[in-house]
Amino acid sequence: MSPDPMVPVKVGVIGIGNMGWHHARVLSLLRDADLVGVADPDAERGKLATEQFGCRWFADYNAMLSEVEAVCIAVPTLLHHPVGLACLHAGVHVLIEKPIAASQDEATALIEAASAAGCLLQVGHIERFNPAFRELTKVVANEEVVVLEARRHSPHSDRANDVSVVLDLMIHDIDLVLELAKAPVVRLAAAGGRSAEGPIDYVNATLGFENGVVASLTASKMSHRKIRSLSAHCRSSLVETDFLNHTLHVHRRAHEWYSADHGELLYRNDGFIEEVSTTSIEPLYAELEHFLQCVRGRETPAVDGLQASRALKLADLIEQAVEHPDTGAPLCTPI
């Protein structure tokens, strides 16, 4: 850990596919980061990164670990466990992309390794840093949330085809509704399937929380357009969030009647919409800035290993419910 707050944190990026490239891009711009290098077996990609970001390229990430204090891991999900363990065993702080791992056992191993090494383990649930979600948490703080409704649709692509739509897309919203509901999940039901060979690519899941909140989540890779939305139905309002456009609208009812001087009704106001201002900061920029502050000991991770493990456990149960429809019964143990 850099003791001098004026000295940037030496950081590296492991995996420079689509997401890893953006990690390197943002880190190269952050004042608190010294992007030492990127690690990826693809030499051509590595050369492009060194030219673009002014850092070094490592064919083997292990060769980079002795030169950095922290890493961002953006490799395929199946590699999260071995790569994460190697970094933590080397005493390096870790920000790992979501999901934390491919299985609950692997997630537990990462959490235990971080604790034993005294290292940070932060998980990249990036929507926590979306300006619209940050404002949403403020708006509903004084509201009684009843129903949460999330939609996350994308066109089919060649990325992230090693995991289901639950682990690729829906897990974002699982994490968000857990944060908003602030209660254990006691009921779960899900339906979905696959449009072709490969992992599940469309799912709807319903989560029932101990405090009565119900969340409906839909994720699909069959859409021709991207949708990233979350609505909070509260006792006295409806809050609609668009994560793509970073917008937030609050719908409220009104009960005011307007009449002329002689008592004749002219019109009535049935409701109004508030447009909440949000910042224009890039969520990844905010996430990485937060990670660096955590490395310096100034903040605690917004999403640590335990929180990410809880989201993964629910994702696993949703997948099981889709594959085995007869299992949509109340959970034996609240999650």
Predicted features by range, described:
Residues 1-5, 70-72, 210, 290-335:
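C-terminal helix-rich "cap/oligomerization" subdomain common to oxidoreductases
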Residues 23, 53-111:
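Beta-loop-alpha module in the N-terminal Rossmann-like domain of NAD(P)-dependent dehydrogenases
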Residues 174-251, 281-298, 316, 333-335:
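Contiguous beta-strand/loop segments that form the cofactor/metal-binding neighborhood of enzyme cores
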Residues 1-53, 177:
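N-terminal Rossmann-like dinucleotide-binding module
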Residues 59, 73, 96, 121-123, ...:
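Hydrophobic residues in well-ordered beta-strands that form the structural core
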Residues 101-160:
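A contiguous active-site-proximal alpha/beta segment in oxidoreductase catalytic domains
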Residues 41, 275-289, 303:
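Active-site loop of classical SDR/Rossmann-like NAD(P)-dependent oxidoreductases
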Residues 124-131, 155-187, 307-308:
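Mid-domain beta-loop-alpha active-site segment that forms a flexible
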